Amino acid sequence: SAALAGTIIAGASLGFQILDKVLGELGKVSRKIAVGVDNE
């Protein structure tokens, strides 16, 4: 049904937003680690 499809799409888009945020945070952490290694 259309309602189910809408729910799935909303859930998928929310999932992508969360994933994007998590990947962004991991990217910051790995840059910090890389900078820390360079500084030693």
From Swiss-Prot:
Highest taxon in the source lineage: Eukaryota
Q: What is known of its domains?
A: Composed of a long N-terminal alpha-helix and a core region rich in beta-sheet structures. Before the pore formation, the alpha-helix binds the lipid membrane, partitions into the lipid-water interface and stabilizes the monomeric molecule on the membrane. Finally, it traverses the bilayer, thus forming the transmembrane pore.
A Pfam family that the UniProt record links to this protein: Anemone_cytotox
**MF terms per GO, please?**
channel activity; toxin activity
Main subcellular localisation = secreted
Return the GO cellular component terms, semicolon-separated.
extracellular region; nematocyst; other organism cell membrane; pore complex
Output this protein's name: Cytolysin SmT-1
Positions of region (Plays an important role in the hemolytic activity): 3-12
Q: Which GO terms describe its biological process?
A: cytolysis in another organism; monoatomic cation transport; pore complex assembly
Q: Where found?
A: Secreted; Nematocyst; Target cell membrane
Q: Which residues form a coiled coil?
A: none
Q: Which family does it belong to?
A: Belongs to the actinoporin family. Sea anemone subfamily.
Keywords, A to Z, come to:
Cleavage on pair of basic residues, Cytolysis, Ion transport, Membrane, Nematocyst, Secreted, Target cell membrane, Target membrane, Toxin, Transmembrane, Transport
Q: What does this protein do?
A: Pore-forming protein that forms cations-selective hydrophilic pores of around 1 nm and causes cardiac stimulation and cytolysis. Pore formation is a multi-step process that involves specific recognition of membrane sphingomyelin (but neither cholesterol nor phosphatidylcholine) using aromatic rich region and adjacent phosphocholine (POC) binding site, firm binding to the membrane (mainly driven by hydrophobic interactions) accompanied by the transfer of the N-terminal region to the lipid-water interface and finally pore formation after oligomerization of monomers.
Q: Where is this region: N-terminal region?
A: 11-30
Q: How does it assemble?
A: Octamer or nonamer in membranes. Monomer in the soluble state.
InterPro entries on file:
Anemon_actinoporin-like (IPR009104), Cytolysin/lectin (IPR015926)
